Amino acid sequence: MNVKETPPDNYFKCVKVSLKHVLKHYEIIQPKINQTVIKAHKIIIHTLQFMKLYLLDYYDTHKTLPKIDKMFINCCMKILCKEKSIGRPPKKEIKELKDKLTNFYNTHYKPLCQDEELDYTYMNNILNYLTNDIVTMYENNIKLHYIEYVERYVNVMWEKKFMTKQIRKIKKTKKDRDSTISKLNNQLRKVKNDVLNIEDTNFKSYSYYHSWIKEQKKFIIPTKKKFRKNNLYYDLQCNPQDYLQCMIYMMKQVEKRGYSTNNPFPMRNDIIPKHIRLDTATLVHLLLTKNYGKKNDYLYKGNLKKNENKIWKFFFRTERQCFTKKWYSFHHMIETDGVSCSILLLRKDKVGKRIRINKIPNKEKYINELKDYTDIQDKKIVAIDPGKCDLIFCVDGDNKNAKKFRYSQDRRRKETKSKKYGKLLLEKKQETIIKYETELSMYNRKSLDIKIFKEYCKKKNKINSELFSFYFQELFRKLKLNGYWNRLRSEQKMINQFKKIFGNEKETIICFGDYEQKKHMKYKEPIKGRGMRTLFRKNGYQTYLIDEFRTSCKCSKCGGGSCEKFMIRENPKPFRNNLRLVHGLLSCKNCANVWNRDCNGATNIYKIAYNSIHNIERPSYLCRNTSDILDDMSKSQFTRPETVKPCSIKCS
């Protein structure tokens, strides 16, 4: 009896290929698409600059902000472009808004621009998609960074940096310094929690801070009668724009004190053209010529939907394999930057139906949160310790015979050719381009002072006009596409090797340490964290999280001995002439065993996973005691991934 296959969970699928691979009459059509990409790119650059200038001026005048909706952004885009004399007249409210924006543009922004006319002929649909993107940019920036702004504001107002320096000067022993700095951090953490807490007026911080907290809440938390579910964090996700003016206020205060600021306004600083979205109507407007018939024959009376397959076949090789996948069919929409092309596919059973997309991502489960282990008890356990140098270090046991596998950052760099491409681009830039970019770096794009930001805009627009011809070369976009393909190739090669060593997805489950990097570390290349777990899930593996508390610093062989760095060597950085301890090599104080740090961590993760699956208590030397739980609880509930780690409740 054949088992009926179930369709995949994802409604949409994206396939990225070269535009040349799918476009017919490439020499004729590609220049038209490329020109549209460049026009859209210029419009976005100017729109984001103009919006920041207008919103700053509006805030300084009214101490509030207008609603940043699709109508407002679309009007901003169109007043920056050459006005069309044809078409139906706009609605009254749109005309009034456009007049207001035009007056501001002529007075404040036009003098900062070069003599260049923008136009959006046949680009109405493209502008609508870009409008949605800008709304998303603003709202995502607020949702992700508002809490960070509050924390930075508190640190600056209470001079955390200065106080820390003074403590380091005054206190003579390392123990005293660390203890005093820790107390200061705990005090400020309580202040931040009190500021962000709208449910409880009983402040947890010292009474010394209470009057300041009450005063500042008026400015850094929106003034509203009711927060959704009486919770600031939930309300932030529902109504992000309510928090933008608070972010502006905080960063203005930080800037007044001479500190570097974050930018509450999204900007496009990169000059290399980005992707635009093309749908069937845009194809008809942009590319359809008299050879294919009259445009009106396709645009009206429902003919656009009826003939969409025919229209796409005029210009694209839709018979190619990339347009049809198992379970999926072409959704008649692509994104392109003139060189690469991302084809959007829709699940066949959802074609013509209204699609409800679940915006809440699936929460990753900790292994000890599962209620039933019967399905996975017979499967092989692979423990993975994620890190910086070894992106993943895998083991399938806690003894000498355990199989090991690692995927390193050096290997990824080599296979993706990122270093090679970086050098190639640097050679291409030569001295003139670097000189221009160095000159621009002297101006502050993040400033919330209108005069300073105007100076930046003027210089940026001038340098852009000089550098457009250089950065619009196809080489930059080709290297970006090649980098994407190389990353896919490297990751698939790694997955294939993993399968050979540890078995396929039906035989194996994977337990990841819950390492989470909230911010990018200086001087380190970007790494895949959550993305690595997603990669294994997409390849069919069941993945679970493990609380990796003490997994690296406790010996997995003797069960609890402290592992410490012991080997000293010269610092590999040529500009530092000191000796340093080797980070990746540890020695156990108890049994004198020498460990690779990642191997020790992965082995401890394996022990925790094995115990959880077989209903055995977590090893005691890897448990949190009461003070550890309290320390974890004292951290901001808005920045921690979990309120309490699952293992802490089980082992306390």
Feature-to-residue mapping (PLM):
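Positively charged, helix-rich recognition surfaces that bind polyanionic ligands
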Residues: 1-652
